[in-house]
A protein has these predicted regions:
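Short alpha-helical elements
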Residues: 1-133
Length: 133
C-alpha cells in the first residue's frame, strides 16, 4: 500500500465537480493565466494546514512538494506575487459557496453512516488539570 500524506487525503475528499460548477457560474477563471481557482483553493488549504505565516511560506512550501502537486490537480506551484494578487482580486464568495456546498455534501454522507452504540463497561477518567499553588 502506498503512503499518502494527510494533506492529500483531505484534498481527495473535496467534491471537485461541485467546485468546477461554481467556478463556471462565478466565472472566476475567466482571465486567469496558470493560477486557477482550484490552485488557489489548494494554496489556501495548504496555508491553513501547515500554519504558514506569509505568502513566501505558502509559495516555498508548495514548491518543495512540486512532484506531489500533480496528484492534487495543481500543475505548477504558484509564485508569491500570483498568490498575493489572487488573494486581493479573486471573488471570495466562490469559496464561501463551496464551503456550504461541501458542508451539505459531507453532512449527507455522514448521516447515512451513523450507528448507535452502547458502552457496556465502566469508563475511568483521569483529570490532568494542573493547580497552581
Amino acid at each position: 500500500m502506498s503512503k499518502i500524506n494527510l494533506f492529500s487525503q483531505i484534498i481527495s475528499k473535496l467534491d471537485r465537480p461541485s467546485f468546477n460548477k461554481l467556478v463556471l457560474e462565478k466565472q472566476t477563471d475567466k482571465h486567469s493565466k496558470g493560477y486557477d481557482s482550484w490552485t488557489h483553493l489548494i494554496s489556501m488549504l495548504f496555508c491553513q494546514f501547515s500554519g504558514c505565516q506569509s505568502v513566501r511560506d505558502i509559495s516555498n512550501g508548495l514548491r518543495s512538494a512540486t512532484g506531489n502537486l500533480n496528484h492534487l490537480g495543481v500543475d505548477l506551484a504558484p509564485s508569491k506575487s500570483s498568490i498575493s494578487y489572487q488573494n486581493q482580486k479573486r471573488d471570495w464568495t466562490l469559496f464561501q459557496e463551496y464551503y456550504y456546498a461541501l458542508l451539505t455534501h459531507m453532512g449527507n454522507l455522514s448521516g447515512k453512516q451513523r450507528t448507535k452504540f452502547r458502552i457496556k463497561s465502566k469508563i475511568f477518567l483521569l483529570d490532568a488539570t494542573t493547580i497552581s499553588l
